[in-house]
């Protein structure tokens, strides 16, 4: 079963992604985090336990403390995470936001509300 890490500071969006997973009956192990740092620490723990890497990580563009682009750039600089698909999501449809996400190393940019089946198609 594919593994998805989802990072968003909004409790509503964290609830929504799990709701959509159930509603769309998407076969995915979903792990949600409210901060970029929590997601990064979880990834490092997965490596230590030799559990493999998640297939996809999607992070919200705008979060306090560290943005989604900050997390993506951090993961791209670390070879241990080179095989993971990385995406940015946002309620923004601004071209500048999309370009900034891709420049940080994101493989794709998604507008909210999210379509979980569409995310998994990006594997």
Task: Label each PLM-derived region with a short phrase.
Residues 2-21, 57:
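Conserved acidic segment of CheY-like receiver
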Residues 32, 65-66:
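Residue-level signal for the "D+5" position in two-component response regulator receiver
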Residues 32-56:
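Acidic, metal-coordinating helix/loop segments flanking the phosphotransfer/catalytic sites
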Residues 63-65, 94:
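The feature encodes the CheY-like receiver
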Residues 114-123:
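C-terminal output helix
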């Amino acid at each position: 079963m594919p593994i998805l890490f989802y990072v968003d500071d909004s409790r509503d969006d964290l609830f929504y992604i799990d709701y959509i997973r159930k509603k769309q009956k998407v076969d995915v192990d979903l792990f949600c985090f409210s901060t970029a740092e929590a997601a990064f620490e979880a990834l490092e723990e997965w490596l230590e336990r030799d559990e493999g890497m998640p297939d996809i990580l999607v992070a919200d563009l705008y979060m306090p403390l560290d943005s989604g682009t900050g997390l993506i750039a951090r993961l791209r600089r670390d070879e241990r995470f080179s095989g993971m698909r990385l995406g940015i999501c946002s309620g923004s449809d601004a071209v500048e936001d999309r370009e900034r996400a891709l420049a940080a190393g994101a493989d794709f940019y998604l507008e909210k509300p999210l379509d979980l089946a569409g995310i998994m198609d990006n594997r």
